[in-house]
């Protein structure tokens, strides 16, 4: 049985600023604890990046102080997408990469993500070591052994060149008009340059971060602005990233959303690589599974969370996986979810096939799916609640085997997510309504 973790969630540590570990004094100690673990493993250099939220500067300073107190050298990247930190950690031969971000969450949240020297999410074992070190009293190394900090000035340029190198189109993007929504986040100074330098005409929105507006009515979790702009600009398609750049969603020329499931379908069926199977999650649409099956491609489902998709891919020796929400893994190109790189793979397929995004998505028909989030006081007992178990069973029986229900707790927010999928929208609307009411009764 796995040992429970005290601080780490499904994607690092995350909370509202000023709550839990997301306070300057505690982040300083977290930096020290992580530094202590790094030193215990005989290593001594970390790289720190962040998204654009206002609290990032405060936590960057706190982490820097903690690592230096532990005798670990620090390289500061400034605002940089999460996947860029993973990539640069490898190319600079750092021993770990740290990202200060709450991903798609609002500005009042923040968090810490951790990468190994190989640019991969750290293991459960290392997370347990960090938690154990955090419980110890902080002690500072001698003055002569303190770590040193420096800023890396050419990081953005290095990452832009890497992204461009993953593009496999037979020709440049001259003639394409693309709208990019950078979510007022970490891709704001990266993504437009990548696509412009590949030859596209770029209309960029969400590129004026002020520390507060990250993910606010924009980006991969709120596509309305992008959809309207793609249609108004008569663009070929649009691409949206989330606040830290590890998610991607797309919009076709008609303004219709192309989500993570459809992106995975396009990648799996459009690549020249031999694809035996791909990894999705419990949330992946039944339409994806059916469409892939017709192509002889297996879909393996995991728990929700890109780390679980990654684990499945490593276990199977496969390279493609995705969550519906837009975490897309292309392990033939990167070590972690990378919104810019994933989008470039789709664009490569468009260019090489001569097909539009609308045409590429047509091989997959999505089942109607409704996902509703319920903010709750506590998620305790969700998996053992008898009333909820019976309600789920009754709901699936009413749908006659042509639908499914998934109720799960968010790993990063005080939410219970209710998802119902089936071949009739009116039916699933009715089922969602009754299940949400029950969740509110039992947990609010």
Swiss-Prot record:
Pfam families, alphabetized: PGM_PMM_I, PGM_PMM_II, PGM_PMM_III, PGM_PMM_IV
InterPro entries: A-D-PHexomutase_a/b/a-I, A-D-PHexomutase_a/b/a-I/II/III, A-D-PHexomutase_a/b/a-II, A-D-PHexomutase_a/b/a-III, A-D-PHexomutase_C, A-D-PHexomutase_C_sf, A-D-PHexomutase_CS, Alpha-D-phosphohexomutase_SF
GO biological process: carbohydrate metabolic process; peptidoglycan biosynthetic process; UDP-N-acetylglucosamine biosynthetic process
Any GO molecular function: phosphoglucosamine mutase activity
Keywords, alphabetical: Isomerase, Magnesium, Metal-binding, Phosphoprotein
Catalytic activity annotation: alpha-D-glucosamine 1-phosphate = D-glucosamine 6-phosphate
EC number from the UniProt entry: 5.4.2.10
Location of the active site: 103
Cofactor: Mg(2+)
Post-translational modification: Activated by phosphorylation.
GO terms under cellular component: cytosol
Keyword Isomerase annotated: yes
Domain of life: Bacteria
The record's free-text note on cofactor binding: Binds 1 Mg(2+) ion per subunit.
Binding site for Mg(2+): 103, 242, 244, 246
PTM annotation (Phosphoserine): residues: 103
PANTHER family assigned to the protein according to its UniProt record, in alphabetical order: PHOSPHOGLUCOMUTASE (ALPHA-D-GLUCOSE-1,6-BISPHOSPHATE-DEPENDENT), PHOSPHOHEXOSE MUTASE
HAMAP family: GlmM_B
Family matches, as NCBIfam families: glmM (TIGR01455), PRK10887.1 (NF008139)
Task of the protein: Catalyzes the conversion of glucosamine-6-phosphate to glucosamine-1-phosphate.
Similarity comment: Belongs to the phosphohexose mutase family.
Name this protein carries in UniProt: Phosphoglucosamine mutase
UniProt organism field: Hydrogenovibrio crunogenus (strain DSM 25203 / XCL-2)
């Amino acid at each position: 049985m796995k040992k429970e973790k005290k601080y780490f969630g499904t994607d690092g540590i995350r909370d509202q600023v000023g709550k839990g570990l997301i306070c300057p004094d505690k982040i300083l100690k977290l930096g020290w604890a992580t530094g202590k673990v790094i030193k215990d493993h005989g290593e001594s250099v970390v790289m720190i990046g962040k998204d654009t939220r206002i609290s990032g500067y405060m936590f960057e300073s706190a982490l820097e102080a903690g690592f230096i107190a532990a005798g670990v050298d620090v390289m500061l990247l400034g605002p940089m997408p999460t996947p860029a930190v993973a990539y640069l950690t490898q190319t600079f031969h750092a021993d770990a990469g740290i990202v200060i971000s709450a991903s798609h969450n609002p500005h009042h949240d923040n968090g810490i993500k951790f990468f190994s020297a190989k640019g991969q999410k750290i293991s459960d074992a290392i997370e347990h070591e960090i938690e154990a070190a955090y419980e110890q009293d902080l002690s500072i190394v001698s003055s002569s052994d303190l770590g040193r900090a420096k800023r890396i000035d050419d990081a953005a340029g290095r990452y832009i060149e890497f992204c461009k190198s993953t593009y496999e189109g037979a020709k440049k993007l001259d003639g394409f008009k693309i709208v990019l929504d950078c979510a007022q986040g970490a891709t704001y100074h990266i993504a437009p340059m990548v696509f412009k330098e590949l030859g596209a005409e770029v209309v960029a929105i969400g590129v004026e971060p002020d520390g507060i507006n990250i993910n606010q009515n924009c980006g991969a979790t709120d596509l309305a602005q992008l959809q309207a702009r793609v249609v108004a600009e008569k663009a070929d398609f649009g691409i949206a990233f989330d606040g830290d750049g590890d998610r991607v969603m797309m919009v076709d020329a008609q303004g219709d959303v192309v989500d993570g499931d459809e992106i995975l379908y396009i990648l799996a069926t459009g690549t020249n690589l031999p694809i035996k199977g791909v990894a999705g999650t419990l949330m992946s649409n039944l339409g994806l599974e059916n469409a892939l099956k017709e192509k002889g491609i297996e879909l393996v489902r995991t728990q929700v969370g890109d780390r679980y998709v990654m684990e499945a891919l490593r276990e199977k020796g496969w390279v493609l996986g995705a969550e519906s929400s837009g975490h897309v893994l292309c392990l033939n190109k990167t070590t972690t979810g990378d919104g810019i790189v994933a989008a470039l793979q789709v664009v490569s397929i468009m260019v090489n096939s001569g097909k539009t995004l609308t045409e590429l998505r047509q091989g997959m028909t999505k089942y109607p799916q409704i996902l509703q989030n319920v903010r709750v006081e506590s998620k305790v007992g969700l998996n053992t609640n008898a009333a909820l178990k019976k309600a789920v069973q009754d709901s699936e029986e009413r749908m006659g085997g042509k639908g499914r229900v998934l109720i799960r707790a968010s790993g990063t927010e005080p939410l219970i997510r209710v998802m119902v999928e089936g071949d009739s929208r009116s039916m699933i609307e009715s089922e969602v309504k009754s299940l949400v009411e029950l969740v509110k009764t039992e947990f609010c």
